Design a protein with these regions (language model features):
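Non-catalytic alpha-helical scaffolds and adjoining flexible linkers that form interface surfaces
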Residues: 1-183
Length: 183
């Protein structure tokens, strides 16, 4: 199993027999379980000794679309967070977005918020207030991955691979970067 821990970051543990139907670890080894885990850290992989479910997010697991978006967010975490790297912000962000998703909020919007906030955690902060080339704040028409930010109408030719944006999209990207997910 791989779980994200508030205190120790990403932790890989072995849960012996978790796939068996009558095993005590069956319920805590399901996807997206928020719980309390007790594990033994040996020389190799840690071993799960005990686990209690706090919340299992059944509404996410029962809807394929929600499950897909939640799995995508979990995979982003798995790929970007180093083993045993403490990051309480990402733990709280992921948990909060799972809760919001279970309450019925749009999983696509929640995932976009997660992706935007993950760029900051990865050390990449795109320029979302003005054109990265000339500094103009009006007529933002595209986003350049190469330049890591918005391009105005005049500078959009600087990057032939720039992604053209609807005016509302640039506003949403700014909002996603700064929004408090608790709201």
């Amino acid at each position: 199993l791989l779980f994200l821990n508030h205190e120790f970051g990403k932790v890989a543990v072995m849960a012996r027999g978790a796939k068996k139907t009558r095993n005590r670890f069956r319920s805590v080894s399901q996807p997206f379980v928020h719980g309390i885990f007790l594990y033994y850290k040996g020389r190799g992989m840690s071993t799960l000794n005990q686990g209690d479910v706090l919340h299992s997010f059944p509404d996410i697991r029962q809807h394929i679309v929600r499950m897909s978006y939640a799995a995508y967010m979990a995979e982003l975490l798995e790929k970007t967070v180093e083993e045993r790297e403490k990051n309480p912000y990402l733990f709280e962000l992921f948990l909060t977005l799972l809760e919001q998703m279970e309450f019925g909020h749009d999983p696509e919007v929640l995932t976009s918020i997660f992706e935007t906030k993950m760029t900051l955690q990865a050390g990449i902060q795109p320029e979302l207030t003005k054109c990265v080339c000339c500094g103009q704040t009006d007529q933002i028409v595209s986003f350049s991955v190469k330049e890591a930010g918005f391009l105005c109408k005049r500078c959009t030719d600087q990057d032939p691979y720039a992604i053209h944006l609807h005016p509302k999209t640039s506003h949403l990207l700014r909002l996603f970067l700064h929004i408090d997910v608790q709201r």
